[in-house]
């Protein structure tokens, strides 16, 4: 595998800009974790025209879903796995998919996705701005799985107010609802009502102000001076001392702190200054104490660790401790769209991500964090690197950033201004490509690995259902053709290939994948081997009169049976027991003929999934009629390639490619995802087969040697 063919001048990548269809489509993550007996909040990510309504079956006792918002809430049940079948409906159709609640020590089972205020507001974001930006996140990003908003540092400035137990309080000049003992609870309640999790940034240690006052530590006999360590300052924030995390007093301090945050309704905490350059590890005793304090707090809180402006390149030394205690941890200094001063640029990020891709022993729920995404508009009060501006990354570099973060995978924390997305179609399309996000949020939680290096890189990542993601990253400035054999990627046979940034199926590749990658850009594909199932991804839609039985986009796609008019749909009517035929895979039965319950049901029109190749609609119509039914539906697919997975999952959970065309039922027309189309348009990928000539290989070798002489091997 590697680069073949001569380099060309750089072109600007064109990604699919197609908006989601009017009919509902359920998005990931499809697995979410929570701690037993703690408050539960999860808003179903769903796209489609307003107004959506939601129903669910399989909800544990004490857990409900709000019909108008899709917010699942209540008290997390006992440890276990709870599949919940969710249906979203609107005037254009309906969609059904299964979400799995995993109760246990199981937060952040897929990389967290959200927005942090720092890149756009520095230390100055206000309560009203958090509400406004949270509203924008809810409208533009949450339907695709972005579900957290975080206030970054120094929310206690000006004034550094503390309570009687030495704990910082929000500055009421910025957060007027935090008067008295309210803290952040009124703001957290408003964020939760949007279906979003609420997070804050804090500094490691204890306020010097509290130490000087020797404040009593709540619910203990200790004081601030018992816990604090004035020989362990933060090197860049003169408000804090360290804490003796391995002492009873230090543990009491952190217990008190996190009990306060839990009472405020905080769901996500980013702790800064966690790196200790002298010991070459995170401040491990404090990390241990923080973990214990969170577990005692009675609330499920995602723990994010940030190093501060130190060199985290040796952090794999701490990997075991981090995997035990943290949900995510930074692996770079602050990542920006420039390399000014101590900041981390794209080359720096590549180096760190390569390092962590090779670290073993990491498990789902514990993620190396390549930092926030400085994309879109960075302002209105950006503090670092050039003031307010649209990101300095080129469009090609922006696609590379999103691809690389997806392949590691890293948490996806947007740093740009969400309110600007309504007038920034490019950035919105970049952040909401559901096929790329499905790789990021894949339930297998596998880590990516670099399989080819040099001036161009190839990365692969195992996905659920036996599939693979492969990314071709062009580190050069000129366009280049890159290729990899399927066997070198661990794929047997000829897989179905899906180009995710262009939302297009790729045909004609039998033993290898050869693609043209614009300079400084990246392309990402999914490979679905013959006979494998599709992913559990986005639930597709059935038409206004049909049951929620459409297979989702991707390997779950195929012709679907709609519910016939005249009665309750039969058991097979809601999408059939298998998905659809995958190209090269098993020809799938579509909706299936579902007899009505008790003889009173109407017929379901199932599609006999006769096609297993790359063309054609689904097969003949089928359907039985219950005693009270009025007619059988028709299940012929409307055209296009039928899915890309093999045997798809049940109830219309998604696969890796576009959904197959829908069938028509007596009660309405089902809406599939459009077969092999690019979901109503989008861009086609420049995919060409190429064979290297001896001359071209000599040219590439000479160019690489010249680059090494000029810039060093790591930058070539």
Give the ranges of each region predicted by the language model.
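Carbohydrate-binding surface patches
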Residues: 399, 405-408, 413-415, 452-491
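C-terminal membrane-anchoring or membrane-association module
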Residues: 704-716
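Aromatic-lined carbohydrate-binding/catalytic grooves of carbohydrate-active enzymes
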Residues: 119, 137-279
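Strand-loop-strand motifs at the edges of beta-sheets in extracellular beta-sandwich domains
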Residues: 61-78
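Ser/Thr-rich, Pro/Gly/Ala-heavy low-complexity intrinsically disordered linkers and tails
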Residues: 4-9, 532-705
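Glycan-recognition surfaces
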Residues: 227-232, 244-246, 252, 256, ...
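C-terminal beta-strand-rich structural cap/linker in extracellular carbohydrate-active enzymes
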Residues: 508-533
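Extracellular interdomain linkers/hinges and stalk-like, low-complexity segments
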Residues: 10-48, 93-111
